[in-house]
Regions:
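N-terminal secretory signal peptides
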Residues: 1-45, 50-56
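Histidine-rich, glycine-flanked metal-binding segment
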Residues: 64-72, 76-78, 85, 89-130
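C-terminal cap of metal-dependent C-N hydrolases
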Residues: 83, 438-440, 445-492
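Divalent metal-dependent hydrolysis catalytic cores, especially in the metallo-beta-lactamase
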Residues: 161-187, 198-207, 261-274, 302, ...
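Histidine/acidic-residue-rich, glycine-tolerant segments that coordinate divalent metal ions
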Residues: 183, 192-315
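Active-site core of metal-dependent hydrolases
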Residues: 211, 267-377, 384, 388-390, ...
Length: 492
């Protein structure tokens, strides 16, 4: 691989030593979660009971009423002044502007000298103002649950834990996430209604998997399952649904759409963390994948597909899938097919370093190594052929790993110049989210600082023209965090 994959502004971004990391979407640990999560409560019961569980969080961030005869703080426009602006487009940081916010939206970018009557002024002290970050492959409900907790905790604790992690996610500067599988619907609702604090969630609902596929977390002792037998615990929980044949695929996809999925996640190939499906396996027939694509298309949204191999990638594209998740083993033919069909490539930094998962068995370590070697090539091919590329992390069952979210973005400057990479994690990722079309739960523009966009903003100590290292330590370097025009952190 070239030592200068990206050369914007004549800068060479050299590759360092790469060690492998791999996808964690299909760990068998999910089975442990299933056994505990829904033992005494169905998903419908949870939807009804989440309000009670989240009640202690309600109102923590409510605006204080103003003095008599004056507007409440929340009713006043907010004016950010004295700043350096990265607007999300990838253009260089600029000065000489302010950011005016009214309610949930950015309303204008007035000149630096312009006064705004009645506005609440926030002096940014010459620091960087940028859009909130977006992670397009995040597991909201499953990222921060360790194995022992999954084995021993009751349902209430698990969902309270997910709510706390949602708040931490926001405090790392991530104002939006695309959930890549799991029962996130109720948590999304609680966040939207202000019951808890967290990022915007684009939910996929349960991952759709074939029998023996990447989302089949049953034990071998559970096999075979007769047609009239009840669903497994993982299915009842809403982590994954098993579907074989076009009819079952249609049913399971339609169920997730009914529950509120903004897009559908189908598992079209093997993985590393899962025990039963080899990395090289191809999953779902083209007809089965097409059935899911058509069901999603009838609801004016799309299918994202977990897949690694060229064969699986090409099959998914032929079926109409719009976003390839992972794809680190892609070859030039399959990448050209992505380009020609306008398919997105949602890549993750699967590099075995301090942020990677540790596997005890040699088989999975070997698969992990193959994926990591492919990661380097994948970033090279994505740029060579101009593929629309999203960025995400895919942290799963790793409480310590969730804290690395920003660092996993920052370290990718070995593949991209920092401004291009920051654009990828803001406005480019927002374009990927917008593929949800009519099912988009947040229809205003995201990932940009422009009039009409959601007021999701960060004020940071850092210079994206040099590097993104400041995102590795959000507690120290993110001085202000705003979502929906509401300030959740201010240490200016």
């Amino acid at each position: 691989m070239s030592n200068a994959i990206a050369t914007d502004a004549g800068m060479a971004w050299k590759t360092g030593p790469i060690r492998p990391r791999a996808c964690t979407c299909g760990s068998v640990i999910c089975h442990l979660l299933h056994e505990r999560v829904m033992t005494d409560m169905s998903r419908r019961m949870f939807v009804g009971g989440v309000a009670a569980m989240m009640a202690p969080f309600t109102g923590l961030y409510a605006a204080e009423p103003g003095p008599a005869g004056t507007p409440k703080q929340a009713d006043r426009p907010i004016l950010l002044t004295n700043l350096r602006l990265f607007d999300g487009t990838g253009k260089p940081v600029r000065q000489g502007v302010q950011v005016l916010i009214q309610g949930k939206l950015i309303t204008a970018l007035p000149a630096a000298a312009e006064k705004v009557e009645g506005a609440q002024v926030i002096d940014c002290q010459g620091k960087l103002v940028m859009p909130g970050l977006i992670d397009t492959h995040w597991h909201t409900m499953l990222a921060a649950i360790p194995q022992m907790t999954a084995m021993t905790a009751d349902l209430g604790y698990l969902y309270l834990s997910a709510a706390q992690e949602a708040q931490r996610t926001l405090m790392r500067g991530f104002t939006s996430v695309r959930d890549a599988g799991g029962p996130a619907f109720a948590l999304k609702r609680a966040i939207d209604e202000g019951m808890v604090v967290g990022p915007r969630i684009y939910p996929s609902g349960a991952m759709i998997s074939q029998t023996s596929g990447h989302g089949d977390f049953r034990l071998r002792s559970d096999i075979p399952r007769a047609a009239n037998e009840p669903l497994s615990q993982v299915e009842l929980t809403g982590v994954a649904m098993i579907a074989d044949g076009e009819t079952e695929v249609l049913r399971r996809v339609r169920e997730q759409l009914m529950l509120g999925a903004s897009q559908i996640k189908m598992l079209a190939g093997g993985g590393v963390a899962s025990l039963y499906d080899p990395l090289d396996s191809t999953q779902f027939t083209e007809k089965e994948l097409r059935a899911g694509v058509e069901a999603a298309g009838d609801w004016n949204t799309y299918v994202m597909a977990h897949v690694y191999t060229p064969k699986g990638i090409k099959r998914a594209i032929k079926a109409g899938v719009k976003s390839i998740e992972h794809g680190q083993l892609a070859d030039e033919e399959s990448v050209k097919m992505m380009r020609d069909e306008g398919v997105w490539w949602s890549l993750q930094p699967f590099l075995q370093d301090e942020d990677s998962n540790v596997y005890p068995d040699p088989a999975r370590r070997e698969s992990q190594s193959k994926v990591a070697q492919g990661t380097v090539k994948a970033y090279e091919l994505a740029q060579k052929y101009g593929i629309k590329t999203g960025w995400g992390t895919d942290v799963l069952f790793n409480p310590k790993g969730t804290a690395t979210q920003g660092r996993q973005l920052a370290k990718l400057t070995r593949f991209y110049d920092p401004l291009t990479l920051l654009k990828q994690a803001t406005s480019t990722n927002a374009e990927l989210l917008a593929l949800s079309g009519e099912r988009n739960p947040y229809p205003q523009p995201l990932g940009r600082i422009a009039p009409g966009a959601y007021a999701d903003l960060l004020v940071a100590d850092g210079d994206p023209a040099v590097n993104l290292d400041f995102l590795s330590n959000p507690e120290q370097n993110l001085r202000l965090i705003m979502k929906d025009g509401k300030v959740h952190k201010n240490t200016l």
